[in-house]
Amino acid sequence: MSTECLKPQTGGPQSQSLSQGGQYGALASGTCLPPSTPVPWSLPRWRAYLAAAVLCYINLLNYMNWFIIPGVLLDVQKYFHISDSHAGLLQTVFISCLLVSAPVFGYLGDRYNRKAILSFGILLWSGAGLSSSFISYQYSWLFFLSRGFVGTGAASYSTIAPTVLGDLFVKDQRTCALAVFYIFIPVGSGLGYVLGSTVAELTGNWRWALRLMPCLDAMALALLILLVPDVPRGAAEKQGEVAVRAPRSSWCEDVRYLGRNWSFVFSTLGVTAIAFVTGALGFWAPKFLFEARVVHGLQLPCFQEQCHSQDSLIFGALTVATGIIGVMLGAEASRRYKKVNPRAEPLICASSLFATAPCLYLALILASRTLLASYVFLALGELLLSCNWAVVADILLSVVVPRCRGTAEALQITVAHVLGDAGSPYLTGLISSVLQAERPDSYLQHFLSLQHSFLCCAFAIVLGGGFFLLTALHLEKDQARARQPGKGTLDSKDIASRNTESQGLLSGTSTPTE
């Protein structure tokens, strides 16, 4: 920002009148006027709530796009003539592109217009989804590629949208907003299954499910452009103050800063443990429950290529119901407990994970004796796991400086997927296969092998609880640092030198350099 300095005027009534008038006297004396003060940034509450509602709606569509293909997976396999192993690659391609893209969007989201990046992501995933519905069966590789583009678009939204919410609200309002936002993860996942299978059944063509989603995406894009403001980073924490651009740092400086932020590091490891368990449960739990029914004599063994079972539907309904209740329960407990204990958030996460471990263990052990008890404890375990989603997002936003939150979200997503749900289904299946190789070939032994392989999830969830206890030890210190003006990824010397330079420019003087 530049200032203009006028030369002093001598003589004449005009110069005398100027010198008598305060500000005009400064002009007459030849001193520099400070630049005009920027208008403080503020946003009415109703605009913030409206923007949050739009972001929640888009999050619903985001996860519907994630799980619409699994809802019509059998039809996709028949159309493209692909086996189960190749069908599994659809999700692998999706997750891989999401993992590669998340750090890129995190970097861009910390430095450029987040609203434009979100719009690009919606256009990308809706365009890829629509175009995939017109691909001929001879070009199945194009269909796989399109799922990769959908994953890339989803990465932009999953990385940046929570940071926008974090800049719209603070404290209890932020916790409630994040709770509502993360409710749409299980709801969107379940609706993706329902929409895909229902539209395919009504129209007789699975591709119409992919053609319907872009209509909803177009509405979401219009709402985003019209109703969601371009919020300055850290705006909620500085409501009513002048929004000053912070010194820009490199991506390596951001990562180095996050690596020294122990609350972020330990909470990310805790989230990874949660992702490990949810990934294994989501993939193997329906089959485990199906084999439990076979052992109890309630279900005939599957001798056909397509097995008809209600276990997937029941498990999906449990996931949606427990997800909604769990997210709201965790957010409300965090909001109330924070009033008496500043370390409430990681302590709630740790206690819920420690309580999940025995529930999961009992659900596995009791499945061979009573299926009803297994369902009850499995539902309790999923409920306790869901209590963490909004709380861990609130932890991240409270311990990371605003200009680095996009990178933090991206790194947390990447680590949680790479070390969590990307490998846990394979590891669980590998342990089950190794155990089956050493046992007689029977339905009972198949069930017991999968049952024993699930025990690694109980261990992982206890480990995650320990990481959240470590988070509690550092939480207050990291929150205080994130609230301090000028703190961030740059070293203190760099910040001091840049502040000195800016003050020199404003005062019309320069600082000598060696």
Swiss-Prot record:
One family name in Pfam for this protein = MFS_1
The organism is Mus musculus
GO-annotated cellular components: membrane
Task: Return the protein name.
Answer: Protein spinster homolog 3
Annotated TM spans: 54-74, 88-108, 116-136, 149-169, 176-196, 212-232, 264-284, 313-333, 347-367, 376-396, 415-435, 453-473
SUPFAM superfamilies registered for this protein in UniProt: MFS general substrate transporter (SSF103473)
For this protein, the record's PROSITE patterns field holds:
MFS
The free-text function statement in the UniProt record for this protein reads: Sphingolipid transporter.
